[in-house]
Amino acid sequence: ICIKSWAAREVERVRQAMHEMAAADLIGDVPIELVTGPDEYLFGEEKALLEVIEGNPPLPRTVPPWMEGLFRRPDSPNPTVVNNPETLANVPHILREGAEWFRSIGTEDSPGTMLLTLCGDVRYPGVYELPMGFSLRELIHGIGGGAPEGRTVKAVFPGASSTIVSPEQFDTPMSFDAMKAVGSALGSGAFVVYDDSACIVRATLAFSRFLYVESCAQCPACKHGTGQIAELLERIDRGEGSEVDVDTILARSLTVTDAQRCALPTGETLIAQSAIQVFGAEFVEHYGRPCPRPREIPVPKIVDVDEHGAFVYDDLYRLKQPDWTYADEEDRTT
């Protein structure tokens, strides 16, 4: 079981659950180990996760876990199954209620429920468990309450690694196949909403810089490519960009995935291309002048939920550098 080390409360709860299961003799001879890992984005990538379990930094391998797994050796590849806890959370319900019950929820191709995280410019952000097939419009407006008063929803970013969803696509069912059909992805079910007061160039820059910072630098095309795209987006945001910079971003987005070990640079490609294709007019508005919607748009990195149920964001992430250090360690600890 792998958890980020900063999640102390969650780590302690899992440890307590393990002790309770052992005391009740529910584990048997199956060894269960808890591994705490770094805060890096790539800790969630399955090949990098195996490296962390073996005591190494979260650097993705070239071979998937089902071919070479934990503690592999030349004579024993040790294929390993890596599952998200949300997947495993369905198992006891299926065992208790049966597969037919499970398939009665959701859609034929994507049965069951999913935890969907909704944040950004909505009245009621939160984490909601909903049946697969629920539309994005129902999530944003029916459950999330829509945009703040006087505003309209402009775009939705499905996490940090997929095509931006425009309002015309909000009726798409939230299932893996349906989201893929419109050129996006359901991913981990995280949706960041931006209303018409937000600048798409600046939002794209925030996500692009996040991917640049979190790139492990094993693949030069990824590290240099995400860095160049982020630099060009920042130039455009300052009002110093031009059509040439947009064309360069599009060209670089085609090569950033060369020899990739993981899907991180694919996320850069999808976000950059969709932002320019769908919101190209906003890029043009920046040519020769500063951002016409000068609103701060930080990376929406959620670290907790407060006593009122509101998300708590990592305010120090702005200090994180591409080598995974922080620009000002004193600020980080105060």
Q: What are these language model-derived features?
A:
Residues 1-43, 48, 151-171, 176-177, ...:
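Small-residue-enriched alpha-helical segments and adjacent helix-cap loops
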Residues 2-4, 35, 119-121, 130-131, ...:
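Generic beta-strand/beta-sheet core signal
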Residues 11-132, 322, 327-329:
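Hydrophobic alpha-helical positions that pack around
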Residues 41, 154-163, 184, 209-231, ...:
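Local cysteine-cluster metal-coordination motifs and their immediate loop/turn environment
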Residues 59, 64-92, 176, 182-215, ...:
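Gly/Pro-rich active-site capping loops and adjacent beta-alpha segments
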Residues 64-65, 74-75, 81-87, 152, ...:
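Intrinsic disorder at enzyme termini
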Residues 132-148:
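Short amphipathic, charge-patterned alpha-helical segments
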Residues 145-155, 197-218, 235-264, 281-289, ...:
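Immediate flanking context of iron-sulfur cluster ligation sites
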